[in-house]
C-alpha cells in the first residue's frame, strides 16, 4: 500500500469494511482501516521536515485518530468515504450513508460551495497549499486521490 509501504494485511486493509466477511471480523489485518501498527509515509516525511498535504477520498478510517490530520498530513481536504457525487455531498444510494462527509484540516465541512466539482476543488487545494508554503524552502509531499474515476 502506498501510504504505509507494507502489505495490506499488515496495515489493516486486508479487505474494505463494506466487504469484510463474517469470518474476517475481529481478525488482525481485517480492521478495514489503516491501523496504528504501521507508520505512514507522511508521518515519516513530516518528521524529516517535509510539508505534507492530502486531498481526495480517504476511506481508511473515520475515527479521530485515523483521519488524515492524525496520520501525518498537516493539511487536508478529504472525502471520508470511498466515493460519491462529484458535484455535491450526496452519497451513493445507500440508506446508511445518504450524505458524504468532507473534512478540511481535520474539521468537518458542513456545506460544500454551490459550484463544487471534486476534481477542480481537490486540484485547487493542492495548488493553494504548495503556493502558501513554497517560500520556506521545505520540500513537500502531496497525496491526491481523485474520486471522479468512480
Locations of regions flagged by a protein language model:
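Formylglycine-dependent sulfatase
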Residues: 1-150
Amino acid at each position: 500500500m502506498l501510504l504505509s509501504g507494507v502489505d495490506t494485511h499488515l496495515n489493516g486493509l486486508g479487505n474494505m469494511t463494506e466487504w469484510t466477511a463474517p469470518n474476517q471480523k475481529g481478525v488482525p489485518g481485517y480492521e478495514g482501516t489503516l491501523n496504528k501498527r504501521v507508520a505512514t509515509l507522511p508521518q515519516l516525511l513530516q518528521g524529516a521536515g517535509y510539508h505534507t498535504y492530502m486531498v481526495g477520498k480517504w476511506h481508511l478510517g473515520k475515527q479521530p485518530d485515523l483521519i488524515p490530520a492524525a496520520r501525518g498530513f498537516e493539511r487536508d481536504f478529504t472525502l471520508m468515504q470511498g466515493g460519491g457525487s462529484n458535484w455535491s455531498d450526496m452519497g451513493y444510494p445507500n440508506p446508511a450513508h445518504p450524505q458524504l462527509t468532507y473534512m478540511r484540516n481535520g474539521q468537518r465541512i458542513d456545506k460544500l460551495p454551490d459550484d463544487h466539482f471534486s476534481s477542480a476543488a481537490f486540484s485547487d487545494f493542492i495548488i493553494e497549499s504548495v503556493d502558501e508554503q513554497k517560500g520556506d524552502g521545505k520540500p513537500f509531499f502531496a497525496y491526491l486521490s481523485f474520486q471522479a474515476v468512480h
